């Protein structure tokens, strides 16, 4: 039992144990004492908790137009996708503010499915939305998930990532955003229900249904598999926004067949070459996703479907140079800190974009290409005080010549050529 005084008979704080001589004030209660320092600490904790609650009431959710304007600062192109996402996100958090029901009208969740090729900006759009709204954000890879009881991750581990992103504040996590990538990889192998167990396909879709719709999920705090003798974190997924993304390679022929089979007369079919193949993805319908291998219930949990276009050469050049976090701007800023001006020639940027298209990596491949080009520059220039300007040329990108370096007096020098052993 805690003693309220020490050997000398002095009163002590019941919380920190300091005597009345060690603190400025000791407040007495029924059989308990608390010092001014503990009162101050408790006040700070309570204010912090209340502050978090106010922050997550979402009274000032940005309007769809404002959301798209901020997305424009970080993501190039994809205007239709931005518009769809802005409206869906605005409606989702408006629904949270209203308490899901308005005059007996129940507002359903607006989870989102993004379809687009690798490197088209799906993950970046989801990350930027979370940053705009200042909510916890987690990314999960659908390919690592398996049905409960099999080797792999349980779907509840997705929720654990969100809880960790919210510093284990479950209330904050319950209003966060989860992006599930590679969702097309959990399509079942055929359109027909499988007799055999499909633990990483249809089984995962079934497991995801409840958390997408809204349920009280039990999450193991350390991750991994559940077992009966461990504690769980309870989290309500009703107000978590789920954004699923995937390339859906192979869905174009399904869309093309549907569009080409418009019956004329007594069952004659249109020539399938009449179908415009350029923007097939934008014409996707739930029935195409069903044929691809998503189960009807899973498609129903993702009411907002938006598509992203493949990035062309000019879009990739814009991605390199225009956004706030453009990689060229980042390298220019880093070299500026060393007193060096960095310049990319237009032809060099165009060649970098062409390489990314050839590799079929989209915007994702731009960073690795630039980092390969800039490695020697970033290694050597900080040690050279005679360089004022560094120019990346077409030949630099092609690997035939090193970057052009210019001294403070205007004379041109070159980095030493590397010779292979």
Curated annotation (Swiss-Prot):
Subunit organization: Component of the ClpX-ClpP complex. Forms a hexameric ring that, in the presence of ATP, binds to fourteen ClpP subunits assembled into a disk-like structure with a central cavity, resembling the structure of eukaryotic proteasomes.
InterPro entries: AAA+_ATPase, ATP-dep_Clp_protease_ClpX, ATPase_AAA_core, Clp_ATPase_C, Clp_protease_ATP-bd_su_ClpX, ClpX_bact, P-loop_NTPase, Znf_CppX_C4
Keyword Metal-binding: yes
Protein name: ATP-dependent Clp protease ATP-binding subunit ClpX
Keywords from the named record: ATP-binding, Chaperone, Metal-binding, Nucleotide-binding, Zinc
Limits of the ClpX-type ZB domain: 1-54
One MF annotation (Gene Ontology) recorded for this entry: zinc ion binding
Amino acids binding Zn(2+): 13, 16, 35, 38
GO biological process: cell division; proteolysis involved in protein catabolic process
SMART domains hit by this protein: AAA (SM00382), ClpB_D2-small (SM01086), zf-C4_ClpX (SM00994)
